[in-house]
């Protein structure tokens, strides 16, 4: 089945890279603010992930990547995008604007069959690869791939809960800057702190990522909450999860459980490292979450802090494609 991308921002462009890498077919891109020639440039050059290795060009009004033709639309409203013209059925909604079932459903007018929101959603069912994909059923038309932070936290929480039972926990994500922030102090009426200069501040912020884990792991509903610090790095973030456990264990027990999961059921989603790593070491890492065995600490047999890294752009974009591939498998069964 063919994929369309609405919104050619950080995630939209990296979803296209991920699709090419993973053998998924993107046939259309819509963005009202980016002309075709500029799309070529923005896709080719990336300050964080480097230059695209293949060939990118504009040809006959289409974006051509490695010889594959991608139809380009410049529609402002989702209901006006003629997806069926390009044969696009699975739409990645990565504008960050149409994040509810009602708003995302506008894509169906132009021929879309399914919509995958690349952000948390207030009402669409949320999926995290490695955690709750089995809950997807073909009658679901609009789904959410949750947030990059939920994708990092949920696999770690799953392993902890299944092995040692999470009683309650608090999460902090030390998060790289994103497009919504300001380069210097500027207006941000809904989030005053968020309007302060991104390059010169550590900015406390809210995040629904921890609460969202309760949506993908129902047994943890109401047991986790969290906040964020936005820091002046361009990419790669880290989750710090402090939990009270129901079963006594040593920190070595936790390490062993994480390592086993990373080599078994969560391979490709959860990573494990005992190296002396720092954030840059995870640029371009396509896993959702990499458990840092050396960074975690334990106070008592039931009170621990675990640390896990994630490339908040790249790993997440790969999961969008993984989710679509799973949906296609279920839908065609």
Curated annotation (Swiss-Prot):
D-glyceraldehyde 3-phosphate binds at residues 147-149, 178, 207-208, 230. Its EC number is 1.2.1.12. Pathway: Carbohydrate degradation; glycolysis; pyruvate from D-glyceraldehyde 3-phosphate: step 1/5. Pfam families: Gp_dh_C, Gp_dh_N. PROSITE patterns: GAPDH. It comes from the Eukaryota. Keywords: Acetylation, Cytoplasm, Glycolysis, NAD, Oxidoreductase. SMART domains: Gp_dh_N. InterPro entries: GlycerAld/Erythrose_P_DH, GlycerAld_3-P_DH_AS, GlycerAld_3-P_DH_cat, GlycerAld_3-P_DH_NAD(P)-bd, Glyceraldehyde-3-P_DH_1, NAD(P)-bd_dom_sf. It is found in: Cytoplasm. It catalyses: D-glyceraldehyde 3-phosphate + phosphate + NAD(+) = (2R)-3-phospho-glyceroyl phosphate + NADH + H(+). GO terms for molecular function: glyceraldehyde-3-phosphate dehydrogenase (NAD+) (phosphorylating) activity; NAD binding; NADP binding. The keyword DNA-binding does not apply. The active site is at residue 148. NCBIfam families: GAPDH-I (TIGR01534). Homotetramer. This is Glyceraldehyde-3-phosphate dehydrogenase. It comes from Panulirus versicolor (Painted spiny lobster).
